[in-house]
């Protein structure tokens, strides 16, 4: 089944140089002056110039139907920059733009369209640089050093708005109702869309649209907006503006997965790995006060301490949630890593996963059936695989051209150093023993006898995440593993990409002339003691998969150089991100959930206690998006994931799934 096929826009440029959609036979913007029309209709129609200086919240959220060339977004971004320059002390500090696009432009077509507006070039170039692959769902772009966030939702807007998480309800400050004309694209202009706009709009939110069609005005009025006609731009006689004056009360469709945030802006993060580091940055960007407590004497001493780690998405032959989450997480990770103003060893050399036997070949064939964009993953035959990786393989597979390897240890330490410059407080050699709720705060107790009090707490301490009374029932487990460090040779140095088989082998790091090969797997084992048997197994798995490859025999583990770590994993291979669930209250409240779904209350959680964990062996891929998701949730901001996929990350999911079926939770 072609699950992940997003059709790019097919367009041509008319005599005026304006892009025209072949699918809808309509222009993307006015032939006369598209830039001025955007300023008049959407910025003026929503009165943004007068609203920005008096906005009482640090974040202003705009939603749009039909991203197209991005003209509306770029024009708004330019205006927001001017506002920030003129009003540096204003309460409003950040802009969040949410847009939906069924047929996204290619990067090349986007760049051609942007040539129309040279004055927007400083902003257009940033957008082009981060333009995402045509994958369905939400693509979060962090622009202007995080001051501007763009959520691009690729897919049908009427389907996507039904899939949005409930935390987005009543958050939008202004709507840009754009898109091809109703007569050209009637499928978009529906009561379903108008009702979704009303559901997402906060009381007092505004909307503007270029059309004055009667059915649009009536539909928006029926949805709850107060509508008025205004003079249109240029030769257009009329346009529509509206205000949400009602206070709607949307219902929760799945309250057992509801994500609650915090009105507070102070937290303690427990941990010292890549998840803790990236979460610190994401919260600091939102104005939080953050204190990091780490049991070790420096960061990246746990699972994030390896010399080389592979970056590529996990794909599944049968799990839709994995296939929705990891490709998006991977592309977000690449954008974030590329934008970080820190240095760390890495090479985006590509990753190739080989089908060395019948079972692995079947698995890869099923992964390829997902019809992912070639920029993310594509098939290789044996000859193509050998050309890509640079060594003899005798088999084909699947390649991830944007993947590669990085040094997690360097990355983690560099990010924490960057966060410290931005206000992060760090406390090393602090081993947490217990958490005690005290009124509206959490008291932290450490092995030293020291205590600390914080308004909120995030547990991001790897395989030790279930060491506390509140988290002990979580269905997570430890996985011990050993990665071997091997010296390069002339034959091994030919390896150009990360090679994945029944293990993995990285290209050499030019700074130390070593490769990493691994990793052993010991479920339930928390030992970090070096094992000679694991060294042998790491080498033998390579030889077993490529028995005819002479280069593989040059892998030398006799130097006994290795690193042992412990990962935290779940049975369904997905992370756990969000509120820490109250296990006993969940079982009590949802004892009859299978028979009484309609009257169920929101999920029982520990107020102000959150978690980010169970990243397994793909933490480099999933940690950036997980950190962004949790920071958004904690801050009551839009979450860059659809409700179904977000539910698949909820720490209570394995219990709730059983309760929904009337099964016992053990």
UniProtKB/Swiss-Prot annotation:
Region of interest (tRNA (mnm(5)s(2)U34)-methyltransferase), residue spans: 1-245
Region of interest: FAD-dependent cmnm(5)s(2)U34 oxidoreductase: 270-666
InterPro entries: FAD-dep_OxRdtase, FAD/NAD-bd_sf, MnmC-like_methylTransf, SAM-dependent_MTases_sf, tRNA_MAMT_biosynth_bifunc_MnmC, tRNA_MNMC2, tRNA_S-uridine_synth_MnmC_C
Chief subcellular location: cytoplasm
HAMAP family for the chain: MnmC
Descriptive protein name: tRNA 5-methylaminomethyl-2-thiouridine biosynthesis bifunctional protein MnmC
Keywords: Cytoplasm, FAD, Flavoprotein, Methyltransferase, Multifunctional enzyme, Oxidoreductase, S-adenosyl-L-methionine, Transferase, tRNA processing
Cellular location(s): Cytoplasm
Reactions the enzyme catalyzes: 5-aminomethyl-2-thiouridine(34) in tRNA + S-adenosyl-L-methionine = 5-methylaminomethyl-2-thiouridine(34) in tRNA + S-adenosyl-L-homocysteine + H(+)
GO cellular component, one term: cytoplasm
UniProt keyword Cytoplasm present: yes
């Amino acid at each position: 089944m072609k699950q992940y096929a997003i059709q790019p826009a097919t367009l041509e440029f008319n005599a005026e140089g304006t892009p025209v959609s072949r699918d809808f036979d309509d222009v993307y913007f006015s032939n006369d002056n598209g830039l001025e029309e955007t300023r008049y209709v959407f910025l003026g129609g929503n009165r943004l110039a007068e609203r920005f200086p008096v906005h009482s919240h640090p974040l202003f959220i705009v939603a749009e139907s039909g991203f197209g060339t991005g003209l509306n977004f770029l024009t708004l971004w330019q205006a927001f920059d001017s506002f920030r320059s003129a009003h540096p002390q204003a309460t409003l500090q950040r802009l969040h733009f949410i847009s939906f696009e069924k047929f996204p432009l290619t990067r090349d077509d986007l760049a051609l369209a942007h040539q129309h507006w040279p004055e927007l070039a400083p902003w257009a170039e940033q957008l082009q640089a981060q333009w995402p692959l045509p994958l369905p769902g939400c693509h979060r772009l962090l622009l202007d050093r995080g001051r501007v966030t763009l959520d691009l939702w690729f897919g049908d807007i009427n389907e996507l708005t039904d899939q949005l998480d409930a935390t987005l309800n009543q958050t939008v400050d202004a709507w840009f109702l754009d898109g091809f004309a109703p007569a050209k694209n009637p499928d978009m202009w529906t009561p379903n869309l108008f009702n979704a706009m009303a559901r997402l709009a906060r009381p007092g939110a505004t909307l503007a649209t270029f059309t004055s069609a009667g059915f649009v005005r009536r539909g928006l009025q029926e949805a709850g907006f107060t509508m008025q006609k205004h003079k249109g731009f240029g030769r257009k006689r009329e346009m529509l503006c509206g205000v949400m004056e009602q206070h709607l009360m949307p219902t929760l469709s799945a309250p057992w997965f509801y994500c609650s945030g915090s009105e507070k802006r102070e937290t303690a993060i427990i941990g010292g790995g890549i998840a803790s580091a990236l979460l610190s940055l994401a919260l600091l960007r939102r104005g939080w006060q953050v204190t990091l407590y780490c049991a070790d004497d420096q960061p990246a001493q746990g699972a994030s301490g390896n010399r080389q780690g592979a970056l590529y998405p996990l794909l599944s032959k049968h799990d839709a949630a994995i296939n929705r989450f990891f490709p998006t997480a991977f592309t977000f990770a690449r954008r974030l890593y590329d934008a970080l103003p820190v240095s760390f060893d890495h090479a985006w050399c590509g990753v190739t996963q080989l089908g060395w036997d019948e079972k692995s070949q079947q698995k890869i064939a099923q992964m390829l059936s997902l019809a992912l964009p070639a920029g993310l993953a594509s098939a290789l035959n044996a000859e193509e695989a050998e050309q890509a990786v640079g060594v003899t393989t005798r088999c084909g597979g699947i390649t991830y051209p944007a993947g590669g390897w990085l040094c997690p240890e360097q990355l983690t330490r560099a990010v924490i150093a960057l966060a410290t410059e931005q206000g992060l407080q760090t406390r090393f050699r602090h081993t947490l023993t217990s958490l005690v709720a005290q009124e509206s705060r959490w008291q932290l107790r450490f092995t030293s006898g020291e205590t600390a009090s914080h308004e909120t707490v995030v547990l991001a301490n790897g395989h030790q995440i279930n060491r506390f009374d509140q988290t002990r029932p979580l269905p997570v487990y430890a996985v011990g593993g050993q990665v071997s460090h091997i010296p390069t040779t002339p034959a091994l140095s030919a390896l150009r990409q990360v090679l994945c088989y029944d293990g993995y082998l990285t290209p050499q790091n030019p700074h130390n002339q070593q490769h990493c090969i691994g990793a052993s797997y010991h479920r339930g084992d928390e030992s970090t003691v070096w094992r000679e048997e694991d060294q042998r197994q790491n080498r033998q798995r390579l030889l077993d998969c490529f028995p005819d490859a002479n280069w593989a025999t040059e892998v030398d583990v006799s130097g006994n150089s290795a690193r042992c770590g412990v990962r935290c994993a779940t049975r369904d291979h997905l992370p756990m991100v969000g509120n820490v669930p109250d296990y006993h209250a969940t079982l009590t409240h949802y004892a009859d959930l299978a028979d009484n779904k309609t009257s169920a209350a929101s999920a029982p959680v520990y107020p102000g206690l959150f978690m980010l964990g169970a990243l397994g062996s793909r933490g480099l891929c999933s940690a950036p998006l997980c950190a962004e998701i949790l920071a958004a949730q904690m801050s009551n901001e839009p979450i860059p994931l659809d409700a179904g996929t977000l539910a698949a990350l909820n720490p209570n999911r394995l219990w709730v799934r059983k309760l929904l079926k009337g099964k016992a939770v053990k």
